[in-house]
Amino acid sequence: MHHRPERDKRVTTHVALVARAFGAKGIFIHGEDMNLLKTIEKVKANWGGKYFSIEFVKNPKKVVRDWRNSGGIVVHLTMYGIPIDNIMEKIINKNTKILVVVGSEKVEGWYYYNSDYNIAIGNQPHSEVAALAIFLDRIYKGGELNIQFSDAKLSIIPQERGKKVRKNE
């Protein structure tokens, strides 16, 4: 929420990269940043994940309301929430689409009261990038670490030392 292009470009880019790599279907971004879009489109073109969508929105509260009205649940990641270990099983058992809310600045109180769950990935200040990665890891139970994108032009050959990238046909 509340992407500030000049101040937040790296953090928001990293949120989008983690979301894509760890299995999310897309991301809503409050505000518009064509450089961010170009960066993620380039990643998708080379590394795959063409299904991953980026949608710039003017009214993120409407996104939350519409998501809930369509039967999905809204999870707000915040250090003030319920510990993730206390609530994760309940969320997984819901077996419905999930909208994850992370903020790049002080998040309005409205989101605390209009999310189905306020979840803490620890109760200390930390990065929304880390929080999203941990949350998606818990949702996919580690399976996201093995995601292979069939539309990838490039893929990594794991190495004990060094780097090896393969061009896919």
From Swiss-Prot:
Any one GO CC term of the record: cytoplasm
Pfam families: Trm56 (PF01994)
Record has Cytoplasm as a keyword: yes
Biological-process GO terms, alphabetical: tRNA nucleoside ribose methylation
SUPFAM superfamilies the UniProt entry points to: alpha/beta knot (SSF75217)
Molecular function terms, GO-annotated: tRNA (cytidine(56)-2'-O)-methyltransferase activity
Binding sites annotated in the UniProt record for S-adenosyl-L-methionine: L77, G103, S104, E105, K106, V107, I121, G122, N123, Q124, P125, H126, S127, E128
Enzyme Commission number, as recorded: 2.1.1.206
Lineage: superkingdom: Archaea
Alphabetized UniProt keyword annotations: Cytoplasm, Methyltransferase, S-adenosyl-L-methionine, Transferase, tRNA processing
Reactions mediated catalytically: cytidine(56) in tRNA + S-adenosyl-L-methionine = 2'-O-methylcytidine(56) in tRNA + S-adenosyl-L-homocysteine + H(+)
Subcellular location: Cytoplasm
Oligomeric and partner information: Homodimer.
Job description of the protein: Specifically catalyzes the AdoMet-dependent 2'-O-ribose methylation of cytidine at position 56 in tRNAs.
Family listed: Belongs to the aTrm56 family.
Name of this chain's protein: tRNA (cytidine(56)-2'-O)-methyltransferase
Organism: Sulfurisphaera tokodaii (strain DSM 16993 / JCM 10545 / NBRC 100140 / 7) (Sulfolobus tokodaii)
